[in-house]
Amino acid sequence: RQQLKMKVVMVRDSDVDISLNRRAEIANNNNADIFISIHVNSSYKREAKGPETFFVSLNATDKESYELAMKENESYKEIEKKVETDELKMILWNMAQADYIRESSKLAEKIQAELNILMNTRNRGVKQAPFRVLMRASMPAVLVEVGFISNLKEAKMMKKNAFYRDAAMSIFKGLKKYINK
């Protein structure tokens, strides 16, 4: 906070569930300049490992990214109208989000690079997907998956506080590089 001279608003500081809609609403209500949503990933493929960083798009980078977004969006069972896929509405949404998407992409690249150094693993890359929490944010926004809880090695690492401290430091370094671009 002090190093970047910025106000940080934590959506939560304990293990309580806050809906995806509410998380974005908190950021929007606080007129946040940047939104970072931090998660742990899971996959039916036990060998899946490493961090991934996402930014919003109605079209996912790949099938796996789309399925992850749909799984995460569904897990909150919030009642909401389905995103309309009408071509004109998609074009208007993309135009309104263009600046945020461009900046989100840059932020995602910086964070992903730092996480790759930390995890010393294959670069899963920066991806795009229609995550609800990102679609509702009115600022540059990224969703960071710090690793796979379904991977035995990473799950073991996630039991240690040092893993989260190191992941947080990597995200901080990426954010710092983005801000000082």
Feature-to-residue mapping (PLM):
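Active-site-adjacent mobile loop/cap segments within catalytic or ligand-binding domains
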Residues: 93-181
